[in-house]
Amino acid sequence: AGMRVELVGWDVSWQDAVVDDALAAELRALGPVGRYAVDIQRIVREFCRAETKIDGFDLPDPVAMCCAIDETVVARDLHARVDVHLGHGDARGQTVVDHLGVTGRPVNARVVLRADRARFVAMLRDALR
């Protein structure tokens, strides 16, 4: 009630927050924090290679945090109705975004559609120095 709701979905992460091998090497070279941050992603990197076919590893939580901290990271957004499916079965917990306003229900969230990759990477570098 009265709290601003912002959704940064996983799709933003795999579009704009993937760390490929070249960027991973650059981040590791920043020092012990950068090295640690990249090294703990080893299993995620293997999962991404095998399952999601992402060339690197994605960072959903860091990109969401960067969007919350700095408005300039948000490259494209939408104000829409968002609901969470609370029923049973495979869709339980799924977020449903009314992109077209067809439900007629009031807007209740800002949905981030794309992040500014360059700004995100700059913030990531700064945090890992």
Stretches with model-predicted labels:
Residues 4-129:
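Conformational coupling and interaction surfaces
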